[in-house]
Regions:
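Active-site helix of classical SDR
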Residues: 121, 157, 165
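Substrate-binding pocket helix/loop in short-chain dehydrogenase/reductase
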Residues: 97-98, 105-110, 213
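Short C-terminal tail/terminal secondary-structure segment
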Residues: 146, 233, 244-260
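Residue(s) in the substrate-gating loop at a strand-loop-helix junction
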Residues: 141
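Short, small/polar-rich loop/turn modules that mediate ligand/substrate recognition or access, typified
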Residues: 87, 173, 178, 243-245
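Alpha-helical segment proximal to the catalytic Tyr-Lys
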Residues: 126, 170-174, 241
Length: 260
């Protein structure tokens, strides 16, 4: 559960590693009190150590569990008079095709990557609405537009997040709640490093594999979590007040480059 909070600007971020942790750090530096939610005890502990407890809290939460999210939102409602930002970032990326993705795999990736965004947005909406000028940022992906092989479940959820964001934005604008999505390309995260390790030949160099990933991008490198966090900072801030229902690519020109 969340402990007592005394802050004028509050944000909830789902996920406790990689991009989510960088977003939390950036929002803390912007003056937010950040509640970071994750279901991996090791990642939660590392995030707690990284952020400290003065301007952030890390809460154990499975965003795909409707009852747990409802309890979390109710508890938060007793401690806050409003929520300024919700950043839905938690995600998993299992590998599989239509043949190899099992029903259990499908339910898990949809539960975390899509249903989790709905549950957090649904149960926290009263707190967002009460602010009158809150912002929601949903993490999609370039793979919501164009796809690699063998990522059926992940790509499906990321494409759905684009439609989810547009629909939510249209409905919520009347309440002063702005909703946008972010679509990163290859970003240096634990998830990307895991993928790179699986593709690095025995005796090969992980960094060389990551450099190869970068060559697909017009800029010639992978992105950093801090670069993504800077975009989120803009989208939850007052300067982006006319941004509603958009998808903001941060992909180093990946989709602009024709790799032939």
């Amino acid at each position: 559960m969340v402990s007592d909070i005394k802050s004028t600007r509050n944000a909830v971020v789902t996920g406790t590693a990689g991009i989510a942790l960088a977003v939390a750090r950036r929002l803390v530096s912007d003056g937010f009190f950040v509640i970071l939610c994750g279901n991996d005890p090791e990642q939660n502990a590392a995030a707690r150590s990284s952020l400290g407890d003065q301007h952030a809290q890390v809460v154990e939460l499975d965003v795909s569990d409707a009852d747990a999210v409802e309890r979390f939102a109710a508890d938060l409602g007793h401690r806050l008079d409003g929520l300024d930002a919700l950043v839905n970032c938690a995600a998993i990326q299992p590998y599989g095709t239509i043949e190899t993705t099992t029903p259990a795999d499908w339910q898990k990736v949809v539960g975390i990557n899509l249903t989790g965004y709905y549950l957090m947005s649904h149960f926290l909406y009263p707190l967002l609405k009460s602010r009158g000028n809150a912002s929601v940022v949903n993490f999609a992906s370039v793979q919501g537009h164009l796809n690699q092989n063998n990522v059926l479940g992940y790509a499906t959820t990321k494409g759905a997040i684009h439609a989810f964001t547009r629909a939510m934005a249209v409905d919520c604008a009347k309440d002063g709640v702005r909703v946008n999505s972010v679509s990163p390309g290859s970003i240096r995260t634990p998830l990307l490093e895991f993928a790179a390790r699986s593709l690095t030949p025995e005796g090969g160099n992980l960094e060389d594999t990551i450099k190869e990933f970068g060559k697909s991008h017009s800029i010639g490198r992978v992105g950093t979590t801090e670069e993504v966090a800077a975009l989120v900072s803009y989208l939850v801030g007052p300067e982006s007040g006319f941004c509603i229902g958009g998808d903001f690519p941060i992909d180093g020109g990946l989709r602009a480059k024709l790799n032939v």
